Amino acid sequence: MSKRPTIAITCGEPAGIGPEISIRAAWELRADVKSILIGDAAFLAMIAGAINPDIHLSALSWQAVRNSGLPAFPRDQITVIDCPLAAHVVPGRLDAQNGRYVLQTLDIAIDGAMQHWFDAIVTAPLQKSTINDAGVPFTGHTEYLADKTATKQVVMMLATNATLQPLRVALATTHLALKDVAAAITFDSLAGIIDILHADLQQKFGIAKPRILVTGLNPHAGEGGYLGREEIDVITPVLQAAQAKGYDVRGPYPADTLFQQKLLAGADCVLAMYHDQGLPVLKYASFGLGVNITLGLPIIRTSVDHGTALDLAAAGLGQADHGSMLEAIRVAAQMAAASKASAE
C-alpha cells in the first residue's frame, strides 16, 4: 500500500487473548498499516515486552488526540491511546470491574472513526457477560455500534480468503432462536438487507456490479410451497423488487446445494436466512482465518471470527493464533482503500 491506512484496534476483554493477538497483528503489519491500539497503555506495554522486547509502544491520551489530532506514526512503533483499566487483570479470569473499560475503548474507536481520524476500526473479542455484570445491558458489538452511530439496520457478514475464491456470507437474521427466524424475515427487513449489501459491496469492496446469491429459508427452498411458503410469499417478491432496481441478485436457492463451486463462481456474496444456515460452511473452510464485518454503518468495522479464549489466555502467552486478527486488519485496510476510491 502506498499510503498506510489508520486502523483503530480495540483490544477487547483484557483477561482474554484480545490484547495479545492485537499486539502481534499490529506489529506484524506495521509496514502497511498505522495501527492504533486502544487500551491500558501500561498493561499493553507489559504484554508487548513479554512477546518481543523489540516491540515499541508509544502512548498518548484521547484528550490529546481530541485537542490536537493524531501525531506522526513512525513505522518502528505502535501507538496506544491510553484507556486505564479499572482493576488488575488476571489472564483467564473475568472481572466485572473492567466491563465499563471495554466499552470505553469502543467509544473511543467509534468517536475517532466518526470524526474521520481512523479509516476503520477492528475489534478484538469481548465477554458480553462481564459488561452485563458491570450493570450495563449489552447484547454485542454489532448492536452497540449501530446504537452509537444511530444506524437503524446493519448486516452481519463473515468473509474469508482461505477458500478457492473469496467467500462472503451475510445473514438475514443473526442471534435469534430458530423458532423466531421465520417471523423476523419480512419484506421490508429483507429488502433493506439487500440494499445494504449491494451498496456496501460497491462502496466498501469496490465491486461495480455485485452478484448476490440468496438462500431459501426452508429445506429445498420450500419445495414449491409444500415445505413452507416463505420463499413464495416473502423472499421471491423481495428478489424481484431488487432485480427491478438493476441488482444482480439470484435465488432463492436450497441452502444445502448452494455452496458448490459452480454456483459460487462469479458470486460476490451469499445471503443466508439464519446464523447456522450460512456460517458452518464458511467456518469449516476457514476457522481462525475468517473476518466478521458489520455492513450498513457509516464507518468500517471488522472483527475476528472467534471469542475471548479465556483458557488460552490463562495458559500464557504464545498459545493463541492471531491469524484472524491479521485478516481482520487486512480486510479493514482494503475496505478503507475501496471506500476512498469510491468517494473520489
From Swiss-Prot:
It holds the Pfam family PdxA. It catalyses: 4-(phosphooxy)-L-threonine + NAD(+) = 3-amino-2-oxopropyl phosphate + CO2 + NADH. SUPFAM superfamilies: Isocitrate/Isopropylmalate dehydrogenase-like (SSF53659). A divalent metal cation binds at residues 175, 220, 275. Pathway: Cofactor biosynthesis; pyridoxine 5'-phosphate biosynthesis; pyridoxine 5'-phosphate from D-erythrose 4-phosphate: step 4/5. Its cofactor is Zn(2+); Mg(2+); Co(2+). Its EC number is 1.1.1.262. Belongs to the PdxA family. The active site is located at the dimer interface. Catalyzes the NAD(P)-dependent oxidation of 4-(phosphooxy)-L-threonine (HTP) into 2-amino-3-oxo-4-(phosphooxy)butyric acid which spontaneously decarboxylates to form 3-amino-2-oxopropyl phosphate (AHAP). This is 4-hydroxythreonine-4-phosphate dehydrogenase.
